[in-house]
Amino acid sequence: MAKGKFERTKPHVNVGTIGHVDHGKTTLTAAITTVLSNKFGGEARGYDQIDAAPEEKARGITINTSHVEYETETRHYAHVDCPGHADYVKNMITGAAQMDGAILVVSAADGPMPQTREHILLSRQVGVPYIIVFLNKADMVDDAELLELVEMEVRELLSKYDFPGDDTPIVKGSAKLALEGDKGELGEQAILSLAQALDTYIPTPERAVDGAFLMPVEDVFSISGRGTVVTGRIERGVVKVGEEIEIVGIKPTVKTTCTGVEMFRKLLDQGQAGDNVGILLRGTKREDVERGQVLAKPGSINPHTDFTAEVYILSKEEGGRHTPFFNGYRPQFYFRTTDVTGTIDLPADKEMVLPGDNVSMTVKLLAPIAMEEGLRFAIREGGRTVGAGVVAKIIK
């Protein structure tokens, strides 16, 4: 029975469970929804409902993901849980489910395992900013020293991948006990401690409208007597009539002024994140702007050609390549609205990449693109997507 109606007034935060197979991610997800729905309202979701993750497509890649929501006293959370390891890899690289923070589930009985490490590394590569740890199955460990040892191992592993291991909140508990209604320290109490850690350790994310203005250029028109109009959807920030903006990417950066904002054929004083607008630019010729560039607040973003990336290569079944590729492979990289050719440099220990693999690589583009760490892109060959990636580190 719902306790009162669901209010959307609380700040919204996106989280998800990560960790090794069978360490209890899905059980924990079910336990969180159950305990919090009893306390703050919302819908309890059983293990089976979450485990039967529906298939969805992100950038042509098939991913199984379960979405649940729950709330605490101060926030509303959207939470993703994936059934299989491959789904996590795809989810994190495509950004299908952006996470403001992740709950790393580690079985106290087993300690960190290969996928524990891999999910922490992926979180670092794709820019998940915060990790909280739930040491699950703590009821199965009688030895307090052993628990401490596992906790130390997890902290060391986090620090190794540049997360603040020493300051990371670690909650010990048993998702299974909590799900079964146990009110004890390892049951319901542990879930409430975890909820409190989420509320306090993960800051409220900046809303898109509060960021620095950025709009990918989709189309450019010349309107006689008025000048050049650039259309697109504002990704973040606000642009006001009369403000100076930069055109960034592909060619050298130039400054111009926004002399008008138009939406649905009406003139506005400003456009903001989420709006599909036409922006009138002063003294800019039609041939000065092209699809693939961005309009941005001056100094807020720079064009780059060289970067490292974390990439997932589509399997043959997903419509990807049927054969591996090797060092020096030159596909197109699709950033925001356009393709740019680039050359791939593989790590020394990687001779080739097979369809269905995920890999770290260095990329050199033929033309610079307005770029920052965390930017998503697709890898294409002749117009079809063969991979998805995220910029891990900018080189130049």
Curated annotation (Swiss-Prot):
Disulfide bonds: none annotated. Its EC number is 3.6.5.3. InterPro entries: EF-Tu_GTP-bd (IPR041709), EF-Tu_GTPase (IPR050055), EFTu-like_2 (IPR004161), EFTU_2 (IPR033720), G_TR_CS (IPR031157), P-loop_NTPase (IPR027417), Small_GTP-bd (IPR005225), T_Tr_GTP-bd_dom (IPR000795). It catalyses: GTP + H2O = GDP + phosphate + H(+). GTP binds at residues 19-26, 81-85, 136-139. Residues 19-26 are annotated as: G1. Keywords: Cytoplasm, Elongation factor, GTP-binding, Hydrolase, Magnesium, Metal-binding, Nucleotide-binding, Protein biosynthesis. GO terms for cellular component: cytosol. Mg(2+) binds at residue 26. Residues 10-206 form the tr-type G domain. Belongs to the TRAFAC class translation factor GTPase superfamily. Classic translation factor GTPase family. EF-Tu/EF-1A subfamily. This is Elongation factor Tu. It comes from Bordetella pertussis (strain Tohama I / ATCC BAA-589 / NCTC 13251).
